[in-house]
Amino acid sequence: MAKVMQKYLQKGNYGGKEYIKEETIQKFNTCYFCKEGNRRGVGFDKPQLGTEGPTCGCVSLTSFGHTGFTGGMTWADPDKEIVYVFLSNRTFPDSNASNKLSKENIRENIQKVIYESIIE
């Protein structure tokens, strides 16, 4: 996952090879309906527009990523040159299990610690 996100961070390039055109990454990462209150791009989720959202609130507006049903999260921040990958399986042993990841903001809190440790 980290390599995939790094490829997106590098505008479609990885290891000296172009896998996706830069224009495609740009289109995926554009928030077309932010004015209407929808923070999602075509291919990626974007940072929250208010106080609620998928990130710690410390990421740049150019950042992008995805949170998954099983609790995983990937996020890339071009301005800060950071890739964050959180893998989990909150659905094990069943999908009705408690959702502590969301309720306690575990992914977002880890992301915040990473930003505070590296950036500040």
Please annotate each region the language model reported:
Residues 1-120:
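Catalytic loop of the DD-peptidase/beta-lactamase superfamily, centered on the K-T-G motif
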